[in-house]
C-alpha cells in the first residue's frame, strides 16, 4: 500500500509506468474497445435478437425497423441494454488482445512495432492475432455469455415469452444472472457454455482483423507520415473498417453459433433450435434454414462491426500516440 501511495505522489513514476509498452497497449486497447462498442450498441442489440429468434417473429422486418421497434417497446435504454456489461467485458477483452499482440511482436518475433521499417510477416500476424483472440475469449467469456442473455431478456420474442426465461416480471441484474448461471447450470461449465464455437469464430476473426489492418497500414505508412493528421486518421478509419468487414464476413457463421449456444439454456426448444454439438448445429442450420441461415443477422452485424472496428483502431492509435508523447 505504501508503495502505491509513493507512486501516486510522484507524477514522473506514473508517467514511466504508463509509458511501458504493455501498459500503453492495455490502456489504449481497453479505451478503444469501450468507446467503439458504445457507438454501435443499438446494432449489437438488434443483431443478437436476429440471431436467436425463429423465422416467424417480429424482428425479421429489417435492421432499422427492428431498432425502431426496440425503441418503441423499451425506449432509449432498450437500445443500450447490456452495453454497461459489454463495456465492463470489452475493456479487458480488447486490452488483452492488444497486450498479447504487442508481446508477440516484441518477445516472440523480436519486432519493434514502433519502427515503421520493422514489420511482422503475414503469417506472424495471423499467428499473433489468433493467439490474442484465444486469450481474450478465455479471460472474459462469462461476461460475454451474460451480456447476450441480458440482451434478449426483455425482447418481444413470442417464443421466448412462453419459456421460463420470461416468467419473471423484472429481468435479473448482472450479478444475479452470473450467480444463477453458476448455480443452476453446472458451475464453471455453465459460465463457459458455448466457449468452443465462440473460440472458433473469434480466433480467426481477430487473426484476420489484425493481419488485414497491419498489412493495409504498412501500405500507407510512408505516405501517411507526410500527410496532415486528419488525412492519416481518415486512412486509419478506412482500413479499420475494411479489416473488420472482411474478417467478420468470413467468420460470421461461427458468431451465429456462438450466440445460439449461449442462449440454449434459456429456452432453445421454444426458440426453435436444439443442438448437441458444433457439427450438429452446422448440419441442422443448413437443413432447416439453408445457406442464408448461417448469415442471419449479418447485415446488422456489419453495421455494427465496420464502424466499431474503424473507431477501435483509430482510438487505439490516438491513445497510444497521446501517452507516448505525454
Curated annotation (Swiss-Prot):
This is Uncharacterized mitochondrial carrier YPR011C. It is a multi-pass membrane protein. InterPro entries: Mit_carrier, Mitochondrial_sb/sol_carrier, Mt_carrier_dom_sf. One of its GO terms (biological process) is 5'-adenylyl sulfate transmembrane transport. Belongs to the mitochondrial carrier (TC 2.A.29) family. PANTHER family: SOLUTE CARRIER FAMILY 25 (PTHR24089). GO terms for molecular function: 3'-phosphoadenosine 5'-phosphosulfate transmembrane transporter activity; 5'-adenylyl sulfate transmembrane transporter activity; nucleotide transmembrane transporter activity. Keywords: Membrane, Mitochondrion, Mitochondrion inner membrane, Repeat, Transmembrane, Transmembrane helix, Transport. Pfam families: Mito_carr. GO terms for cellular component: mitochondrial inner membrane; mitochondrion. The chain crosses the membrane at residues 24-40, 84-104, 126-143, 195-213, 237-254, 297-316. The keyword Transmembrane helix applies. Solcar repeats lie at residues 20-107, 120-219, 231-322. It is found in: Mitochondrion inner membrane. It comes from the Eukaryota.
